[in-house]
Amino acid sequence: MERFQGHINPCFFDRKPDVRSLEVQGFAEAQSFAFKEKEEESLQDTVPFLQMLQSEDPSSFFSIKEPNFLTLLSLQTLKEPWELERYLSLEDSQFHSPVQSETNRFMEGANQAVSSQEIPFSQANMTLPSSTSSPLSAHSRRKRKINHLLPQEMTREKRKRRKTKPSKNNEEIENQRINHIAVERNRRRQMNEHINSLRALLPPSYIQRGDQASIVGGAINYVKVLEQIIQSLESQKRTQQQSNSEVVENALNHLSGISSNDLWTTLEDQTCIPKIEATVIQNHVSLKVQCEKKQGQLLKGIISLEKLKLTVLHLNITTSSHSSVSYSFNLKMEDECDLESADEITAAVHRIFDIPTI
């Protein structure tokens, strides 16, 4: 078997070999070679076979000028390895020349040399880097193949492991439960306190039952009633203010016709009305006297009270106008005092200050 050695062109690693173009090229060269044989039939009779081979250019019937490894691999991937022979068999019988048989023997030897290699084309193609494929797509393809090769149980376990969260300690769970219970108890206690205070504010008629819902509903109804009462009171206040303003206007109109001197005399007359008030608490007497101012009236009154066994402890004098005076006595009843009630003391004071009884 002959060994073929030659330079491997690196450009074949960057592209997939085009098998169809090789087939078409071989077919075209075979037809051109057949055409030349028809034109030179006369040479077969005159020139010996060896001279004819020496005179011909080997490039005219060898389609592969520099055989390399990738070209041989592309020839191996054909469904029927020697489709070129099938195309040539359909032509004229002139293709079965010694030159064609030599090319066939050359191709068969190349096929045997390639088939002796243990690397299949699919694996070689897989290992070759592609210019169009990106590193991300290669990584995804490799991941898909690995996932496809793994059994389904292992993939499910991986998914379950991803979904599982880190389990908490029993102490943390117990602490969370205790905190939740404490917060809930505090909330219920505050709610019960608010409900009880609200129930105390409501009238009994608004509480039908003792549950929380009835208490809250009664409070809502009671607030609505209070709003209505406030609205009615505000309306009454407005009407009262209007009526008071009318009364004041009438009084001002009436006073506008009265002179200032007459108004002063009427005020003095109202203040000069005599008044006597007596209050008895055990043996103490509180006496208030309002009367017309007279000369020596106070001294005469104190002497008269001493005769009635009423001792003056404190005295306060106020003058409200030019003609009236007000006395406030704080008296003590002696044991020999014959007066016992407030009415008796009032009658005696009327006689002392010459105030007529009403």
Swiss-Prot record:
Ranges of biased composition (kind: Low complexity):
127-137
Residue ranges of every copy of the bHLH domain listed in the record: 175-226
Main location, first listed in the record: nucleus
Record localization: Nucleus
Q: Does this entry carry the keyword S-adenosyl-L-methionine?
A: no
- Record-level GO cellular component terms: nucleus
Keyword DNA-binding (UniProt) = yes
Which tissues does it occur in?
A: Expressed constitutively in roots, leaves, stems, and flowers.
* CDD domains, sorted: bHLH_AtFAMA_like (cd11448)
Which UniProt keyword terms apply here? DNA-binding, Nucleus, Transcription, Transcription regulation
Task: Please list the GO terms describing molecular function.
Answer: DNA binding; DNA-binding transcription factor activity; protein homodimerization activity
Name the segments for region: Disordered.
125-176
Q: Which GO terms describe its biological process?
A: cold acclimation; guard cell differentiation; regulation of DNA-templated transcription
Where does this protein have compositionally biased stretches of type Basic residues?
157-166
A Pfam family annotated for this chain is HLH
PANTHER family membership: TRANSCRIPTION FACTOR BHLH67-LIKE ISOFORM X2 (PTHR46684:SF16), TRANSCRIPTION FACTOR FAMA (PTHR46684)
Q: How does it assemble?
A: Homodimer.
**Which named protein is this?**
Transcription factor bHLH67
Gene source species:
Arabidopsis thaliana (Mouse-ear cress)
